[in-house]
Amino acid sequence: LKPVRIAPSILSADFAKLGEEVRAIDAAGADWIHIDVMDGHFVPNITIGPAIVKALRPHTTKPFDVHLMISPVDAYLDAFAEAGADTITVHPEAGPHIHRSLQHIKSLGKRAGVVLNPATPAKMLDYILEMVDLVLVMSVNPGFGGQSFIDSQLRKIAAIRKMIDASGRDIDLEVDGGIDARTAKLAIEAGADALVAGTATFRGGPDAYADNIRALRGA
């Protein structure tokens, strides 16, 4: 089993000082930096674009785990790759050809991820699993931080864990939404090996970040 990677979501950071926040979570032990990109069209919120990702890049050497909640998504893949994304994760619903989107991400030399909304079945992975480096399971409906974990997603995580193990490939299984010490434990038990945490990481300000990350890692 891989050690669990913690990917703090900067959606919960102080947007007025994002560079400082990224340096603080890096120092606190974050494995990846999770960047939630929302367009107000695919999801009901607007967050950040490639320019901010690029501005944050000099602040850390940790991998940028960029989750694109935008539609159409293909037009922006190059921009996020150039801005410094390491993993680019896309929704099957965000364009007509998820296979093509994943192919393009790989052609840019980036890790390709696919993300499943709460109602999107694990079966969606049947014909694309061999292309992906990461599967992200949304345990809340995407758009906002601070939501409650949707328990039905544990069954989906377990099903995807079986699919990944059967594939024999090294694919990360990440979970995003409502992650705290309690739900982190459930997600890990179901088979997750990477956790996105916004509220649970950034609660209490910079002095608490290391303890917050440690609590999730030890869940």
Name the predicted role of every residue range.
Residues 105, 188, 202-219:
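C-terminal helical cap(s) of enzyme catalytic domains, especially alpha/beta-barrels
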Residues 4-9, 33-35, 56, 64-68, ...:
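Hydrophobic faces of well-ordered beta-strands that scaffold small-molecule active sites
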Residues 32-50, 92, 140-148, 201-203:
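Glycine-rich, proline-tolerant flexible connector loops at the mouths of alpha/beta enzymes
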Residues 41-73, 77, 184-201:
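A short alpha/beta connector and helix-capping loop motif
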Residues 22, 74-82, 120-132, 177-195:
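Catalytic cores of alpha/beta
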Residues 18, 25, 36, 80, ...:
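Conserved, mostly hydrophobic/aromatic
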Residues 27-32, 85, 132, 192:
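A structural motif
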Residues 14-17, 59, 75-79, 85-172:
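Conserved anion-binding
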